[in-house]
From Swiss-Prot:
Monomer. InterPro entries: G_OBG, GTP-bd, GTP-bd_Obg/CgtA, GTP1-OBG_CS, GTP1_OBG_dom, GTP1_OBG_dom_sf, OBG_GTPase, P-loop_NTPase. The gene is obg. This is GTPase Obg. It comes from Parvibaculum lavamentivorans (strain DS-1 / DSM 13023 / NCIMB 13966). Keywords: Cytoplasm, GTP-binding, Hydrolase, Magnesium, Metal-binding, Nucleotide-binding. Mg(2+) binds at S173, T193. Its cofactor is Mg(2+). Residues 160-327 form the OBG-type G domain. Belongs to the TRAFAC class OBG-HflX-like GTPase superfamily. OBG GTPase family. Residues 1-159 form the Obg domain. GTP binds at residues 166-173, 191-195, 212-215, 279-282, 308-310. Disulfide bonds: none annotated. It is found in: Cytoplasm. GO terms for biological process: ribosome biogenesis.
Amino acid sequence: MKFLDQAKIYVRSGNGGAGCVSFRREKFIEFGGPDGGDGGRGGDVIVECVEGLNTLIDYRFQQHFRAKTGTHGMGKNRAGANGADVVLKVPVGTQIFEEDEETLIADMTEVGQRIVLLKGGNGGFGNAYFKSSTNQAPRRANPGLEGQEKTIILRLKLIADAGLVGLPNAGKSTFLAAVSAAKPKIADYPFTTLTPGLGVVTIDTRSFVLADIPGLIEGAHEGAGLGDRFLGHLERCSILIHLVDGTAEDVAEAYHIIRGEIEAYGAGLEDKPEILCLNKMDALSEEEREEKLALLAEESGSEVRLLSGVSGEGVKEVLRLAADEIWKTRAMEKAEAATGEEEEGWKP
């Protein structure tokens, strides 16, 4: 299935049905009085988070969604039926924005989560509603209220615990394939990976989700290469695993390019914990290893892990470090949630 992580769609809720002007007409009843029913309510526009979806491809070919209009009221005090709702099904991790692409309406993070995006218009009152002691035969009824409309942006941000970042051809897909059951396309040329991929990693007794995003190049935040839009999928990650190609001529430059793009993107990515790895160690001699390791450690100012997705060198150590950080983040989030509940307290 083709991957699509952003869609722009137009939605409109249903109009309310009109009320009915009607009078009771029955044999031997001279003044039957008004019996016009009310109109039905228009359908709502609802967004629902469902399991089994990982793309917004359904919204590529259909971008207009309109809920049904409520049925008009009828004689004999018959109210019109409510209009059918429109339910937009989206994958977990979808964010809904206003047309300005900045105002967040909702963040769909749990299966089964539903929000009413637009309410349908109310149905109009029939003439039976307007009967009073001073007006026994009203000849008026209300039209139904208009539905609401708006254009929204759906943006999918994959929910992963850890994310792989690096230049094209840094070995990210090979690493993902080595540590999970995922089967990404692997080839010896840049931009083999064109869309993000997910894999479930199990280390010891712990499991977490690892995201592989397409490679970044210098100027990605300005649209170079595939751009930096895929960095949005890392915003929910607890930790970044930064892979630097050990066979590159200048490992320090490769490191600084990625860090520069992450900082230019912002959104808190630059503050996330990072495991820095010198990858493809199986292709280097002992002398080259030591030289590039020392250079990268000096330039980054942090500890560098030696790694090879092909031979498996250093893989388990990196996964354990990532799992430790993920579990630490989960514990902090749990503690914060518990604190929030205590502060709120019981209310009658």
